A protein has these predicted regions:
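Short, well-ordered loop/turn sites that connect or cap secondary structure elements
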Residues: 123, 129-130, 135, 149
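Short strand-turn-strand beta-turns centered on an Asx-Gly dipeptide
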Residues: 137-139
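Ferredoxin-like alpha/beta domains used as RNA- or RNAP-binding modules
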Residues: 1-117, 143-221
Length: 221
């Protein structure tokens, strides 16, 4: 059975958390009984007699599922490759370096960068405009959402979507913050990727607690 169009709120129900931080889920409150329970649920207390290993594995699994859902359905294989790559490049004893490398593999993707810049409402919309050929990096068309950016890259857009971009920028709250490694010119719709990022600077941009240590250790068994 194809699960591509499965309602996303059902995945939130399993994880007991609104992973994407979207406000649209609240609009369904009156229509969905289960969703209403989800929005008003209280965290249960773990039994003192619970097995520590079982709880540890469960916590690892939940964090992994949150990351996969937040970055729009990353496959288990893709996430495993990224974690292995971060572990190989970084010193196994240097936790901060591993975290910076892994978060860079997530956030340096062009679809994620467009989302962080507030140019699009979500990562799925970013993937769509990229696949349709509306995004250019250093004057070259990019059609792969997996394209990795480097410091100094200039991102531009086709004139066909300038109205959409302007609408998205205006709909964002004034308090919406763009990460320090991005500079956006709202007048000519150009985006500059200025410098490398770090995990510490991105902690406040996630609507949930991102425990990268659990994610990495899950695949380094």
């Amino acid at each position: 059975m194809n699960t591509k169009y499965k309602p996303i709120y059902k995945k939130f129900l399993r994880l007991r958390e609104n992973i994407t931080g979207t406000k649209k889920i609240k609009l369904l409150k009156k229509k969905k009984t289960k969703l209403n329970k989800f929005l008003n649920h209280s965290l249960y207390q773990v039994s003192k007699n619970a097995k520590s290993f079982k709880n540890f594995y469960k916590s690892q699994l939940i964090v992994k599922q949150k990351v996969k859902l937040y970055y729009t359905k990353l496959s288990d294989k893709q996430l495993k490759i990224l974690c292995k790559k971060a572990s190989v490049k970084g010193n196994l004893s240097d936790r901060k370096k591993k975290f910076d490398l892994l978060i860079g593999l997530f956030e340096n993707r062009i679809d994620t960068v467009l989302y962080r810049s507030n140019i699009v409402a979500n990562i799925l919309m970013a993937k769509q405009i990229i696949n349709h050929g509306h995004v250019f990096v250093n004057n070259k068309k990019v059609i792969s959402p997996n394209y990795f950016l480097n410091p100094g890259d200039l991102i531009e857009f086709s004139h066909k979507i300038t109205i959409l971009i302007n609408k998205n920028l205006l709909s964002k709250k004034i308090s919406s913050i763009v990460p320090s490694y991005l500079e956006i010119n709202k007048n000519i719709f150009k985006l500059y990727y200025t410098s490398n990022l770090s995990f510490d600077k991105l902690l406040g941009f996630f609507p949930f607690w991102l425990d990268l240590n659990n994610v990495i250790s899950h695949y380094n068994k």
